[in-house]
């Protein structure tokens, strides 16, 4: 029987983006939990940290009291860092370029982030899929049939505007961004009884990389993934999969 690893992805992602990484994990199976405002949880809205925790616990009911291994990427990693404090059932935590610092540390205010996100969603519209696909090809380090299918799956056609746009609930995701601001990252000091793996992309601003590394305690296993940017598990699924398998074997999962 395949062992399941749960996955909380970043803003605007889709479960199909996990396929390449999942193929590297042998007898392990990645199961995405769609964040509020995404996928199967498109109409879900959480208003504060308490509601976020209650939503997550509801998602976890299917797993009874079994110990969980969960991966978080980007926004998903930030939220996971807090959820792990409230859900002791989560024993093994894998953070993919997330959960390491507060955006205030970069003097990036919540107001500016909300404005930037709204502008991005407004501008991320395409008259046809060919135009969108060309944009996606430029956004990723590699391109294949799976990325094509995953990219198309995260879009929807707006009949009123006659454009393709991200299939997400804008109101819900803006709430999530505000909720993230209530979390004081990192949360490692509150998770000393958990197993934690941090994977960082090689290609990023050196100042930001140094800040992330500074926030990671020496007892936490941390690796830098070559040939990868922020979309670390999409850019280099082979190396990410190898590191996850190796780490899990050392903690006897």
Question: How should these model regions be labeled?
Answer:
Residues 93-127:
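Flexible "cap/lid" loop of the alpha/beta hydrolase fold
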Residues 127-179:
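Conserved alpha/beta-hydrolase catalytic His-Asp/Glu region
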Residues 34-39, 99, 228-229:
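Short beta-to-alpha linker loops that shape the active-site pocket of alpha/beta-hydrolase fold enzymes
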Residues 2-42:
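Conserved HGGG/HGGXW glycine-rich cap/lid loop of the alpha/beta-hydrolase fold
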Residues 31-71, 242:
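Active-site loop/oxyanion-hole signature of alpha/beta-hydrolase fold enzymes
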Residues 160-216:
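Conserved serine/cysteine hydrolase catalytic core
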Residues 72-76, 80:
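Gly/Ala-rich beta-loop-alpha elbow adjacent to hydrolase catalytic centers
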Residues 228-237:
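Catalytic histidine-centered segment of alpha/beta-hydrolase-like enzymes
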């Amino acid at each position: 029987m395949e062992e399941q690893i749960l996955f909380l992805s970043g803003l605007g992602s889709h479960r199909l983006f996990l396929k390449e990484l999942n193929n590297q994990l042998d007898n392990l199976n990645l199961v995405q939990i769609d964040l509020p405002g995404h996928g199967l949880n498109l109409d879900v809205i959480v208003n504060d940290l308490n509601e976020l925790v209650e939503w997550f616990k509801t998602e976890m009911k299917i797993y009874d009291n079994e110990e969980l291994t969960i991966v978080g990427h980007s926004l998903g990693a930030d939220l996971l860092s807090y959820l792990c404090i409230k859900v002791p059932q989560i024993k093994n935590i894998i953070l993919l370029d997330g959960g390491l610092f507060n955006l205030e540390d970069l003097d990036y205010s919540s107001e500016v982030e909300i404005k930037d996100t709204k502008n991005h969603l407004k501008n991320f519209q395409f008259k046809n899929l060919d135009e969108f696909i060309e944009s996606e090809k430029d956004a990723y380090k590699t391109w294949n049939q799976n990325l094509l299918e995953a990219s198309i799956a995260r879009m929807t056609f707006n009949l009123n505007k006659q454009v393709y746009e991200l299939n997400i609930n804008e109101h819900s995701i803006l709430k999530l961004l505000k909720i993230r601001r209530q979390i004081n990252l990192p949360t490692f000091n509150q998770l000393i009884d958990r197993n934690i793996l941090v994977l960082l992309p090689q290609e990023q601003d050196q100042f930001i990389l140094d800040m992330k590394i500074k926030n990671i305690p020496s007892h936490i296993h941390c690796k830098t993934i070559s040939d990868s940017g922020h979309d670390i598990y999409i850019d280099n699924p082979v190396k990410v999969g190898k590191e996850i398998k190796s780490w899990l074997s050392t903690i006897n999962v």
